[in-house]
């Protein structure tokens, strides 16, 4: 997908690992118009494995040498930190053309995952997530909402998830968009009670979509409990 009004994405470029691990690594970075800090990733890994931030050229050779695989991805670093210095990762689900908020993870680490964030220990962060889940448009703003609509239309999928941050300009910073995004329900801890309505809304939308498609195919209705 090409960026358009309302959203931006990180510029990625594949490169042989031995180039970055050798004496010409910094020259390759400059030639391809990347600047430090930048991200370096081994393709095929998930949940942040083998995905690192390189602050300057001094750390490039060693970092590239220690990552697995013959090919790496050099990725532009787009700063998703807010005025408080914390990074934010929003997740929405796109079900049958509608956009649903799923969660907001806030962390002091640039590499934000809900399971490794400090949401459990920060009531103020949970309040911020609650505000996002309760009124997505007010939290994100019109530019980011327009960006989400553009991404939805470009994907053209019945089911998709999008992870993103917000730029100071109000534009959406796209991290990831795919058709296999997981809807992970929180545990029974009462601290997460505010998240359950949003998750239920997404699951209900998925069930309704499946039933609609099944009815169109002349299939029997699908039991909600089996989903």
Cite the ranges covered by each PLM segment:
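Protein kinase-like catalytic core scaffold
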Residues: 38, 73, 100-101, 160, ...
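C-terminal active-site "lid" helix and adjoining low-complexity regulatory extension at the edge
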Residues: 138, 153-157, 166-227
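Hydrophobic residue at the +6 position relative to the catalytic HRD Asp in the kinase catalytic loop
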Residues: 162-164
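Phosphate-binding site of ATP-dependent enzymes
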Residues: 52-147
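Short, structured loop/turn "capping" segments at alpha-beta junctions
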Residues: 11, 70-75, 158, 205-209
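Short, internal acidic amphipathic alpha-helical interface segments
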Residues: 143-158
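A conserved helix-loop-beta module that forms one wall/lid of the active-site cleft
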Residues: 1-51
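Short strand-connecting beta-turns/loops that link adjacent beta-strands
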Residues: 45, 97, 167-170
């Amino acid at each position: 997908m090409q960026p358009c009004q309302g959203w931006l994405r990180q510029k990625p470029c594949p490169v042989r690992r031995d180039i970055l691990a050798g004496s010409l690594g910094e020259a390759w970075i400059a030639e391809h118009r990347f600047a430090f800090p930048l991200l370096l990733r081994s393709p095929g890994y998930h949940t942040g494995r083998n995905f690192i931030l390189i602050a300057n050229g001094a750390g490039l050779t060693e970092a590239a040498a220690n990552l697995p695989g013959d090919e790496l991805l050099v990725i532009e670093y787009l700063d998703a930190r807010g005025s408080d210095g914390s990074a934010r990762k929003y997740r929405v689900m796109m079900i049958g053309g509608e956009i649903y908020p799923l969660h907001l993870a806030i962390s002091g680490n640039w590499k934000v995952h809900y399971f490794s964030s400090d949401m459990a220990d920060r009531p103020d962060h949970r309040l911020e997530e609650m505000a996002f889940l309760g009124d997505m448009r007010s939290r994100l703003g019109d530019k980011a909402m327009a960006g989400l609509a553009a991404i939805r239309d470009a994907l053209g999928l019945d089911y998709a998830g999008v992870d993103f941050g917000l730029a100071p300009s109000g534009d959406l910073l796209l991290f990831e968009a795919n058709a296999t995004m997981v809807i992970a329900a929180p545990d029974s801890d009462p601290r997460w009670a505010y998240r359950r309505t949003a998750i239920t809304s997404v699951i209900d939308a998925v069930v309704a979509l499946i039933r609609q498609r099944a009815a169109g195919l002349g299939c029997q209705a699908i039991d909600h409990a089996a989903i």
